[in-house]
Each structure stands twice: as structure tokens, then as C-alpha cells.
């Protein structure tokens, strides 16, 4: 076909597509009305408790199973005749991949559905565990048990946690406490069961059975019924337009370079809208705080038992300390969530989170002075309780900053930020122990890291409140009839009286004032 007729054919297709847009606009308006009819407030119960149960099982099948992988440590080391460092990489890889790929889980959940994401993750995790039962080398386990299983867990973990936040508002902290207690309860139950399976069926049989158990993630995914909330920052019209734009992109992108450029622009706009919270100053501060918090919390679970042994505690008593820490962690998950949902603390959940992180940091600072079992038992109780407390409030604090709509994507980023500290903090602590000959420097560094995390968030919140108070004072001084609002950089004063013609408030910039 001549080039001129080719251009004419392409042009006619584009013109036809453009002529169809008015009809599509009517369809979009109709769908927007349907979406508005379906939107609802968080039910704070009902099917929400099934979502909590599903998330509880997800945390058992992901975080508890990950913790139980350490039970295979001696079996892997003996069978493959490898040293501690090589064998320890298995646990580090699965934990790191789970956190690193958490944003991928959010993307799949947002663009397909939470149900599809969790079911797909369950299939991948189960496949990884089953293939691991046929491993012939540690490198095989790095790929199957580490990467494949970790990727499956990542697709399940953050979407399930985000779904709880969509179904609860008044009792959100309690719901998260119950859901995330699955990690501690699952470890408490699965640890002896996995040890029994290894004794009865060898490590290969135990991994095969765990692979079948993890398939329950697919059942959990089926429980995650989607819900549309009234308070979502993106309106139903915006959501439908974004979906329709993606369909249009697939339909017209082959026709011309112009439509390809338009398609890329639309995709960038959709992604920019989904991750717009990354530009929020509050979220940036939270992200930095999470890095320091994650660095501090990890080494204790690796070095508490060795430290107890170094101060003269027996092997059985040292293991008992870890059991205490795990059980109290569960209590902290549930009770602290319930307490912060009470009316007297409901508006101070952010402060409660800071308090819990700071208390764990103080426990670290006291640990080098505790050199007997009667002193280490109260330490395990205190650290375990506040560890469970702040883990419960991480999604609550994230919701307060970014809102419910962006919660899944934001949690993906927050858990992604845990990955590198989880990977590097135990080796750094070990190097400090080897260099100094004691655990003091390692524990002090972890303690100051967690305290800095708490102080940083608290200081940022204090500055934000001082700024808000100052802006309100300026507005009242300039004109008592004016109300103040801000776009993040420039302060505006808005008259309470509405314009009679258009029914819209009149906004004028506050002279001589800027937030930056």
C-alpha cells in the first residue's frame, strides 16, 4: 500500500476513535454514579472480621513460616557440609526479598486486585517450598527457598495488611493487633511442629508439607472482598477514567507515534497519582525514621541467646528468654492495639507509636547492664511487649499520613525500606562484637538508632503543629473573617462568605508568608 494511503488509514482510525469519546464520556459518568452508589464508610465489623482472619492467616503463612526456616539451619549445614555464613544466607535472602518486593505486591494488588495478588503469591511461595525439598545444593535453596518463596510472600503480605485498613476506622488498631499477632502465634505453634516434621520425615519431607500448608494463602486471598470507601482521596470518576485510559491505550497505541506518546503520558500520570505520597514531607520523614527503626530492631533476635550464654545463662534458659519474648510480643500486638483504640488514646496513636519505639531503644541501652537470668526475664517481657506494640501501629501511622486510598502502595514502600537494614544490621553488630570483644557497642548502637527514629518523627510532628498554629494566628490577625488553608508551599486565606454568583470561596495569598 502506498505511504499516502497508509497515512490515510491510520488517520481515519484515530479520527474514528476521537469521535467515539463523547459516548465514552457518557459511559464514564454512568459508571461513576454506580461507583458512588457502591461506596461506603469502613464497616468496622461484619465482613471486616473475615478480612482480619484472612490477614491473620497470611501473617502465619508468611512471617511465621519465615521465622521457622531457621529451624532447618542445622539440617542444611550438616547435609550440605557448609559453614555458618553460607547457610545463614538462606534466611537473609527470603526475609530481604519479602521486604524488597513489597512494592511489587502493592502494584499487583492495585492494578489487578488484592485477591489475585495474594492467590498468585500463595502459588509462588508454595512452589518455592516444594522445589526446595528437591534441592541438591545451597545455591538451589538460595533460588527456590530464598528468592521464589520470598517473592510469593511479598505479593501476599502488604496487600493483606492494607485491606484491613480499608474495613476498619474506629477499631483499626485493634484489628491490626489481632491480624499481625499471627506472626507470634504462628511461630509459637509452628516451631515445635516443624521440628517434629523434620524428625519424622527429614528436612525434605518437612519442606514439602510446609509447601502444602502455604497453599492456604490462596484461601486467604479469596476472603479479600474489595470495598470502595467514601473518604478515598481519588474519586470514583478518577479511578474509572484511569482504567478507561488504560483500555484506550491498549486499543490505539499501535496506530501512530502520536498516540504512543500520549499513551506513555497517561501511564506516567496514573503512576504519578498512585505514588504521589512519595512527595509528601511527612512520608519522607516516616521513611527515614523506618530505616533507623528497622536497623535497631533486628539484631536482638539474632544475638539475645548468644549474649545470655556469654553472661553465664544455660542453653535451656537462654531459649526460654526467646520464648518469653515471642509470647509477650503477641500480647503487645493485641492489647496495645485495643488500648490505643480507646477514646482517651484514639487521637494519640501517633504518640503511642513513638513511645513504643523509644521504649525498645531504652531497653537496648539497659541490656549491657543485665547479666543474670532474673534481670534478663523482665527485659524480654518489656522489649517483647513494645516490639509487638509498634509493629501493630505501623499501618495505623502510615494511614494517618497518606490516607486509605494510597495505603497499599505506601505500606509496600514502608516494608521495602525494612529490607536493607534487616540484611546489614546483624553482620554489622557481629563485626562490632568481634572487634570490641563484647556486645555493649552493638546493643548501644541499636538502642540509639531506635531512639533517634522516635525523636525524628516526634520533632517533625512538633514542627508541623507549630507551623499550623502560626498560620492560624496570621490569618486571624489579618482578618478575623478569613480561614486559612495551604497547598504545602504558599499560605492562602479564604473568606467564609461565598461568592454569590458562583457559590465558591474567594482565595487570596497571605502577603509576605511562605511555608518554605
UniProtKB/Swiss-Prot annotation:
This is Monocarboxylate transporter 12. Most highly expressed in kidney, followed by retina, lung, heart and testis. Very weakly expressed in brain and liver. Also detected in lens. One of its GO terms (molecular function) is creatine transmembrane transporter activity. Belongs to the major facilitator superfamily. Monocarboxylate porter (TC 2.A.1.13) family. It comes from Homo sapiens (Human). The keyword Cell membrane applies. Signal peptide: none annotated. Changing residue 360 to A: Does not affect creatine efflux activity. Does not affect plasma membrane localization. It is linked to Cataract 47: A form of cataract, an opacification of the crystalline lens of the eye that frequently results in visual impairment or blindness. Opacities vary in morphology, are often confined to a portion of the lens, and may be static or progressive. In general, the more posteriorly located and dense an opacity, the greater the impact on visual function. CTRCT47 is characterized by the association of cataract with microcornea and renal glucosuria. Microcornea is defined by a corneal diameter inferior to 10 mm in both meridians in an otherwise normal eye. It is a multi-pass membrane protein. Pfam families: MFS_1. The chain crosses the membrane at residues 51-73, 88-108, 116-136, 145-165, 178-198, 207-227, 283-303, 319-339, 350-370, 377-397, 410-430, 440-460. It catalyses: creatine(in) = creatine(out); guanidinoacetate(in) = guanidinoacetate(out). Interacts with isoform 2 of BSG; this interaction is required for its localization to the plasma membrane. The keyword Metal-binding does not apply. Its main location: membrane. It comes from the Eukaryota. Keywords: Cataract, Cell membrane, Disease variant, Membrane, Transmembrane, Transmembrane helix. Coiled coil: none annotated. Residues 1-50, 461-516 are cytoplasmic. GO terms for cellular component: basolateral plasma membrane; plasma membrane. One of its GO terms (biological process) is creatine transmembrane transport. Creatine uptake is inhibited by carbonyl cyanide 3-chlorophenylhydrazone (CCCP) and by valinomycin. Functions as a transporter for creatine and as well for its precursor guanidinoacetate. Transport of creatine and GAA is independent of resting membrane potential and extracellular Na(+), Cl(-), or pH. Contributes to the process of creatine biosynthesis and distribution. It is found in: Cell membrane; Basolateral cell membrane. Changing residue 329 to A: Decreases creatine efflux activity. Loss of localization to the plasma membrane.
